[in-house]
Every structure is written in structure tokens, then in C-alpha cells.
Amino acid sequence: MADSASESDTDGAGGNSSSSAAMQSSCSSTSGGGGGGGGGGGGGKSGGIVISPFRLEELTNRLASLQQENKVLKIELETYKLKCKALQEENRDLRKASVTIQARAEQEEEFISNTLFKKIQALQKEKETLAVNYEKEEEFLTNELSRKLMQLQHEKAELEQHLEQEQEFQVNKLMKKIKKLENDTISKQLTLEQLRREKIDLENTLEQEQEALVNRLWKRMDKLEAEKRILQEKLDQPVSAPPSPRDISMEIDSPENMMRHIRFLKNEVERLKKQLRAAQLQHSEKMAQYLEEERHMREENLRLQRKLQREMERREALCRQLSESESSLEMDDERYFNEMSAQGLRPRTVSSPIPYTPSPSSSRPISPGLSYASHTVGFTPPTSLTRAGMSYYNSPGLHVQHMGTSHGITRPSPRRSNSPDKFKRPTPPPSPNTQTPVQPPPPPPPPPMQPTVPSAATSQPTPSQHSAHPSSQP
């Protein structure tokens, strides 16, 4: 491009110089013709062109201006030539630089491609190493998980046995306490009935004694009235009509024996009142003591029932957790087996206790603790030890069958037991009050509360007290 521009500049400069030369020649021819014409005119004016001085001066000026322009154009031509040479040099340098840059770019590209190829090879080696490490880690994790699963199953069986023994002990203890409470309640009810009967007997006895005393007093009053009338007759006094015993007032003087008997009756009434108050106080204290004991027994029974419920909930939560862990392990094993089957039965280590039959061409190590055979292999975990010999939980077993020479193994078929994945509650011993075999019997109802009225229910009169009544009477 620089060469073509320089050539066009040189061509333009040559054209301008040729045009200026043509103009100069034309001007000179015109000036010569003018001179010749002048000469001819001077000679004979035969037919030449007459140029006026003004026109001649104008042409002279024009010629001078054209010469000046020609000089300017020559100077510009020289400058353009210099520029063209500089551009040609610059173009040459740019070509050299482009060649150098292209060679350097090729070298850098080759270096980058070599570096990337080395990195790709290193990544491939690292990938192979990671694959080997992953297989080793997977095999280690599988063996570790199988070992932990077996350990969990053993711990589960031990926990089931321990929990069952503890639950049986708690149930027996609770049943003993319930029977003891029932016996105490029955004995207290019998004691209460006996006290009630004794109270009624004491009330009847007291009423009979009071009636006997009143009758005896009336008889003595009648006797005294008769003696009074006899004395009045002896003293020849007019006998007044005998007053009614109910009209006798305290103002009438009584004999000394009547006063003594009245004092005795008052003392007897005071003594019986004291005995009645003491019996009522003793009865209230015993009833409060019985109520307090019954409240303590109810609280103890409720606390034991709550403790039993917490133990049962903890056992059920533990069973659920164990069953969930086993089911998750089964699902992982089944998914892994399906992936292995889809990939062409590549031999891998499998987690115990699910047996797996590898292909005959397998050369990888097999996880220890697994038994392989060509016939049907089934794993059944140890059943939980129960009191009645029943298995409350059966873990699922996977069976692998031999299908001939075409395939070494088939897809395992998970088979779950029909028994629920929970522990059943142990059957407590039958209670005398209830027939429900699952739940413990409810606490016995409280004895009927008797209104605390002033009575002599708890005081049992001694033979000396009963014998004191006839002996103390005059």
C-alpha cells in the first residue's frame, strides 16, 4: 500500500511537471508568435494577431504565477518522495515485525500445547490414582459398615434382652405394689366398717345406759314422794296432791341420796363426753393418716407408671432407629447391586450380611466374613430373645440364587417379615381386679369418705368401763 501510494505520488508529480512544461511551451509559443506578429506587423501587417500590452502583461503575470506554482509543486513532490521512502521503510519494518511476531506466536502456541498435553497426562494419571483410591476406600467403608451392622445387631439383641428383663422386673414390682395397695385398701375398708359398727354399738349402749339411769331416777323420785306422803300423814298434815314428776323444780329440797346420785350422773356424763371427744380425735387422726398413706401410694403408683411409660417409649424409639438404619443399609445395598447389574456385573465387595457370588474370573479380594456358594444363600439375623419365645422383630434377608453358567448371580429380592418392625409389649401377670393383659390394672378406687361427726366410733369400751356403770351406781 505504501509503494502504490508513493508511485501515485510520483506519477502525480510527473503529471504536474509535464503540464507546467506544456504551459510554459504554449506561453513561449504565444509570446514568440506575438513577437513575430509584431515584427510582421511592423514589417507589413500581413495578417498576424495583435496582442495588446495589457494582455501581454497579464500573460506575463500568469506565467510568473505558474512558474511559482511549479516550484511549489516541485517542493511538494520532493516532500512526498521523502514521505514515500519513509513509508516504504516503515512498511518493510512492519513486515519484518509481523514475521517475527508470527514466529513467536507459533513458538508460544507450541509451548502452550506441549504444556497442556503434559497437564492432561498428569490429570489422567491422577484420575486413575483417584479411581483406585476410591475403590479401596469404598471397599474399606463397605467392610466397616458391615462390621458396624453386625455389631449393631448384637447390641440390639442384648438391649432387647436387657430391656425385656428390666420391663418384666418393673411389671412384677408394680404388680406386687398394686396387690399390696389393694390388700391395704381392703383391710382399711374392713377396719372402717368395724369402727363404724363399734360406733353404732357404743351409741346404742350409751343410749340404753342413759335410759336406764333416767328410769332409775324416776323410780327413786316416786319412792321419795311416797315416803314424803307417809311422813306427812304421820305428822297429821294435810296431804297435798302428789305433783307430777315433770313439774318437780329444782327449788324443792331433795334428799341427800338424790343429790349424790345427780352428782354421779353429771360426772358420768362428763366422763362419757371426754371419751367421745378422745374417740373422735383418734378417729380423725387415723383417717388423716390413712388418707396420707393412700395419697403417697397413689403418687408412687403414678410415678412408677410414668417411669414404665418412659421406658417403653425409649425402647420403641431405639427399635425404630435400629429398623431405620437397617432399612437404609438395605436400600443402599439394593441400589448398589442394581447399578452393578446395569454395568455388566462388575465384581465388587458387598456389605455383609447380604451374600454375593462373584464371577469366576474375579481376581479382587473379597470382604471377610461372607460365605459364597453356588446355591441359594440366605441370611437371617439372630431373633430377639423374648419371654414367650416369639420373635418380635425379624430383619429382612436377601437371597441370591444361582441361575446357571450364563450369569453368576441374579438380582436380590428383599423379603420382609410379616411381623411389625416394633417390639410388642410384654404381657403382665393377670390382676385380680382386671382382665386386660396388655395394660397394667388401674389403681383401686379410694374408700368412701365418711363425714366426720362427733361419735364414739373408734373407742372400744373395755370391760372395766362397762363394769363401772353398775358398780358406781348407789
From Swiss-Prot:
GO cellular component: cytoskeleton; cytosol
Gly residues bias: start-end ranges: 31-47
Modified residues (Phosphoserine): S52, S240, S244, S249, S254, S284, S323, S363, S367, S395, S413
Swiss-Prot/TrEMBL Sequence repeat ranges: 106-134, 135-163, 164-192, 193-206, 207-235
Coiled coil regions in record: 53-237, 253-332
Site (Breakpoint for translocation to form RET-CCDC6 oncogene): I101, Q102
Residue positions, PTM Phosphothreonine: T349
Main subcellular location: cytoplasm
Keywords: Acetylation, Chromosomal rearrangement, Coiled coil, Cytoplasm, Cytoskeleton, Methylation, Phosphoprotein, Proto-oncogene, Repeat, SH3-binding
Record's compositionally biased regions (Acidic residues): 1-10
Pfam families associated with the record: DUF2046
UniProt motif (SH3-binding) ranges: 442-451
Subcellular location: Cytoplasm; Cytoplasm, Cytoskeleton
The keyword Phosphoprotein is annotated on this UniProt entry: yes
Highest taxon above the source species: Eukaryota
Bias (Pro residues): 426-451
Biased composition (Low complexity): 16-30, 351-368, 459-474
Residues with the N-acetylalanine modification: A2
Keyword Methyltransferase: no
5 X 29 AA tandem repeats, as annotated region: 106-235
Clinical disorder: A chromosomal aberration involving CCDC6 is found in papillary thyroid carcinomas (PTCs). Inversion inv(10)(q11.2;q21) generates the RET/CCDC6 (PTC1) oncogene.
Domain remarks: The protein has mostly an alpha helical conformation similar to myosin heavy-chain tail that might adopt a coiled-coil conformation.
Protein's name according to its UniProt entry: Coiled-coil domain-containing protein 6
Biological source species: Homo sapiens (Human)
